[in-house]
């Protein structure tokens, strides 16, 4: 590096780093990086106007601007700067990938650490959750896997405040775009795999290989991969990891940790499993048999981090469901779930169908996001038609697409089943609640924890759970 960055930063009394001109603060250094969709060089003047004390670029055309410094490799300069400003990380790092279940597993692992007396945090779709001390983090970018700078900023802050264990989601996009760079983890988990994000990856094979980069590129040599044995492609995954000399263990109905029986009800479930030739049993208030494997993936991650197995099992009764993940709203038979893939929707509906009373009905309200994988829309309609008695199609973050066309693509998969189409999501939820009878169950799917609705380029306040609560007060459904 031709410039001594540490000396430069001291000279200009630099306070922070940024790669986004929108987030630049006074005395920051702005790194003008050319990305997939935007070029940071186009925002140099914007960054300077917001108080950037220096700009670093690999585009020579911009060095005529005052305070702009040229380097041959801006990414390498950013990496060096990160090591200067944000060198610390929690000692124990655990990463979780999978189509569905990532948010649940990272939360379960972090919660369990806290229940066993350790300071832990999780990063992912829901944001940053901190257990065992006050919440320290604000202004987290809305990405499942953060950009490398944001990740290191947060990790440094957590380490500075005594967090020992950090669990984070690793999305296929983040892995494919190498957002984690050289981050290495002690444990890497694979929760599930089914169709999603084909608008980005194009093929299911590319999507799977992107997921597997977590294990190949980021797992420490002495680390372990924890896999859901019920993944359809599990044999391919096992062979792939074996060929790369990666140690792994499986969880599931055919796993090394074998789930033998699950009894579910509206109040939770009782789970039986065997591990190392011993039988175990535990209760959890968390609903959904698919959560059994998520909870037990969390158990094994704790076990291989050095915690006593029996202590971990004993703590599970206190682990809470994640917001928007099969979340039962107050004392009603109405559930909010993030299910936004065909597989997740089918699993959520199957669970609720299995625990409802014989003569009661199961209804679902859902839509599909705009500017996202179009191929899954008809499949989600198909899954709803297979599992639900009443289907209400509505809007779910249509973004810049015509919402009517999105709904039509969903409806094309419903075929002969009856459905109701209500564009306005609040009205759709209200309609679903109004039509509930004694012991009926309603699933509001697709948004989960989200507290917004994206229409065009506008992000409007909208929270499924809060809308349900509001409608319940008006409609007084029978719980």
UniProtKB/Swiss-Prot annotation:
Pfam family, one: Mur_ligase_C
Record note on modification: Carboxylation is probably crucial for Mg(2+) binding and, consequently, for the gamma-phosphate positioning of ATP.
Listed GO biological process terms: cell division; cell wall organization; peptidoglycan biosynthetic process; regulation of cell shape
Entry's Gene Ontology molecular function annotations: ATP binding; magnesium ion binding; UDP-N-acetylmuramoylalanyl-D-glutamate-2,6-diaminopimelate ligase activity
GO terms under cellular component: cytoplasm
Enzyme Commission code: 6.3.2.13
Gene3D superfamilies tied to this protein: Mur ligase, C-terminal domain (3.90.190.20), Mur-like, catalytic domain (3.40.1190.10), MurE/MurF, N-terminal domain (3.40.1390.10)
Pathways per UniProt: Cell wall biogenesis; peptidoglycan biosynthesis
Binding site for meso-2,6-diaminopimelate: 372, 396-399, 446, 450
Binding-site residues, UDP-N-acetyl-alpha-D-muramoyl-L-alanyl-D-glutamate: 21, 144-145, 171, 177, 179
Cofactor(s) demanded: Mg(2+)
Motif (Meso-diaminopimelate recognition motif): 396-399
Superkingdom as given in the UniProt entry: Bacteria
Keywords for this protein: ATP-binding, Cell cycle, Cell division, Cell shape, Cell wall biogenesis/degradation, Cytoplasm, Ligase, Magnesium, Nucleotide-binding, Peptidoglycan synthesis
Annotated catalysed reactions: UDP-N-acetyl-alpha-D-muramoyl-L-alanyl-D-glutamate + meso-2,6-diaminopimelate + ATP = UDP-N-acetyl-alpha-D-muramoyl-L-alanyl-gamma-D-glutamyl-meso-2,6-diaminopimelate + ADP + phosphate + H(+)
Binding site for ATP: 98-104
Modified residues (N6-carboxylysine): 211
Localization per Swiss-Prot or TrEMBL: Cytoplasm
Role noted for this protein: Catalyzes the addition of meso-diaminopimelic acid to the nucleotide precursor UDP-N-acetylmuramoyl-L-alanyl-D-glutamate (UMAG) in the biosynthesis of bacterial cell-wall peptidoglycan.
Family to which this protein belongs: Belongs to the MurCDEF family. MurE subfamily.
Protein name (record): UDP-N-acetylmuramoyl-L-alanyl-D-glutamate--2,6-diaminopimelate ligase
Natural source organism: Rickettsia montanensis
């Amino acid at each position: 590096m031709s410039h001594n960055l540490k000396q430069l930063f001291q000279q200009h009394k630099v306070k922070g780093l940024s790669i986004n001109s929108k987030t630049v603060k006074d005395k920051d250094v702005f790194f003008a990086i050319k990305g997939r969709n935007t070029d940071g060089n186009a925002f140099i003047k914007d960054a300077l106007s917001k108080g950037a004390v220096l700009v670093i670029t690999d585009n020579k055309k911009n060095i005529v601007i005052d305070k702009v410094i040229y380097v041959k490799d801006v990414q390498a300069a950013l990496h060096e700067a990160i090591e200067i400003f944000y060198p610390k990380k929690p000692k124990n790092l655990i990463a979780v990938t999978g189509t569905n279940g990532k948010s649940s597993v990272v939360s379960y692992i972090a919660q369990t650490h806290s229940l066993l007396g350790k300071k832990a945090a999780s990063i992912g779709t829901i944001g940053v959750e901190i257990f065992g001390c006050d919440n320290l983090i604000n202004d987290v970018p809305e990405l499942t896997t953060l950009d490398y700078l944001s990740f290191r900023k947060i990790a440094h802050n957590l380490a500075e405040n005594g967090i020992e264990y950090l669990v984070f989601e690793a999305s296929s996009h983040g892995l494919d775009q190498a957002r984690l760079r050289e981050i290495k983890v002690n444990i890497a988990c694979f929760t599930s795999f089914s169709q999603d994000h084909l608008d980005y990856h194009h093929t299911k094979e590319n999507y799977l290989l992107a997921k597997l980069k977590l294990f190949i590129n980021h797992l420490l040599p002495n680390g372990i991969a924890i896999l859901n044995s019920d993944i359809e492609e599990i044999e391919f995954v096992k062979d792939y990891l074996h060929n790369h000399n990666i140690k792994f263990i499986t969880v599931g109905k055919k796993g090394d940790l074998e789930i033998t029986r699950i009894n579910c009800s509206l109040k939770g479930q009782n789970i039986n499993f065997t591990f190392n030739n011993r039988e175990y049993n535990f209760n959890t208030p968390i609903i959904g048999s698919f959560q059994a494997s998520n909870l037990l993936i969390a158990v094994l991650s704790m076990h291989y981090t050095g915690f006593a197995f029996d202590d971990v099992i004993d703590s599970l009764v206190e682990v809470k469901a994640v917001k928007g993940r099969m979340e039962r709203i107050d004392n009603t038979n109405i559930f909010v779930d993030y299910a936004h893939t065909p597989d997740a929707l089918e699993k959520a509906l199957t669970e609720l169908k299995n625990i409802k009373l014989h003569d009661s009905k199961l209804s679902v309200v859902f839509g599909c996001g705009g500017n996202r994988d179009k191929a899954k829309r008809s499949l989600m309609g198909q899954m709803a038609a297979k599992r639900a008695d009443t289907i209400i199609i509505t809007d779910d973050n249509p973004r810049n697409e015509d919402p009517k066309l999105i709904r039509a693509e969903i409806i094309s998969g419903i075929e002969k089943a009856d459905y109701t189409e209500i564009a306005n999501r609040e009205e759709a939820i209200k309609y679903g609640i109004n039509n509930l009878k004694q012991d009926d169950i309603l699933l509001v799917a697709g948004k989960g924890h989200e507290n917004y609705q994206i229409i065009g380029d506008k992000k409007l306040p909208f929270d499924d759970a809060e809308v349900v609560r509001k409608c319940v007060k008006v409609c007084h459904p029978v719980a």
